[in-house]
Amino acid sequence: MPFCLTETSLPFGKKYKGKVRDTYDLGDQLILVTTDRQSAFDRCLAAVPYKGQVLNLTSVWWFKNTQSIVPNHLIAVPDPNVAIAKKCKIFPIEFVVRGYISGSTSTSLWTQYQKGVREYCGITFPDGLRKNQKLESPVITPTTKETLHDRPISPHEIVAEGWMTQEDWDETSSYALKLFQHGMEVAQQHGLILVDTKYEFGRDAEGRIVLVDEIHTPDSSRYWLFNGYQERFDAGKEPENIDKEFLRLWFVDHCDPYKDEVLPQAPQELIVTLASRYIQLYEMITGESFVYDSNPGPVNDRILHNIQRWLG
């Protein structure tokens, strides 16, 4: 197995550790390091080779591909695992955009619909929809970014509760739908369906609304294979996907990932399969070949060298 990036320790500003990304604060700029940590159940399950590189470079590809729709926070990419970004004031709302009614978690649109819910996040859904059906047009089902847990919220509540102004909501929601429409079109050209995703927006030092965090990555989005979708849907079968669900299921079968203090180690073949799926998705999404590091070694050393070279 090649070297995995699970922890970073860089001599640049204050460090904030997220589930997957480590962020270093340079004042008006941020160093965003995407690691190979694979998280689920609110904890780190494993380290997946090349995952951080795939997520970072997929996001960078989309940032460049969508800058004519909305400006974004990206400044530079000094290393495959690293993005330098403008520090922005982030809106405390996640913009979840859905093109299909799907999902299996307790908060998913399909789970709520099955329970008889027909109004969700201020949107009214008709009777008679089937799981994995394409919606008449994409919808935004926003959630709040809160300490304990995010909660679904309607646009009216977002403004009434003071999360955002009406003007800011109108502008960001318009951007979100344009980004998703473009993402669906590009994905289809590459043999994929962009099912749903989430966006985050902020305001930069000049007062402009910009896209932040990540865009259309395998972690923030769900993708299905385009070929065969309609036939499988008509037959009542699940769409073919390339995602990490099988790793979650392995842990559920072998332990209680919510309660067990120590988790079993995932089999190496499972990790290799997941790494290859991430790389396959990168190549399908971008239409570009994945470039493997020609000088494998400690990733931290490479990152430090590349950032120092960029900083001059």
From Swiss-Prot:
According to its UniProt record, this protein's enzyme class is ligase
CDD domains named among the record's database cross-references: SAICAR_synt_Sc
Q: Name one GO biological process term.
A: 'de novo' IMP biosynthetic process
Covalent S-S links between cysteines? none
- Enzyme Commission no: 6.3.2.6
Which catalytic reaction applies to this protein? 5-amino-1-(5-phospho-D-ribosyl)imidazole-4-carboxylate + L-aspartate + ATP = (2S)-2-[5-amino-1-(5-phospho-beta-D-ribosyl)imidazole-4-carboxamido]succinate + ADP + phosphate + 2 H(+)
Family statement = Belongs to the SAICAR synthetase family.
**Name of the protein in question:** Phosphoribosylaminoimidazole-succinocarboxamide synthase
Question: What species is given as this protein's source?
Answer: Legionella pneumophila (strain Paris)
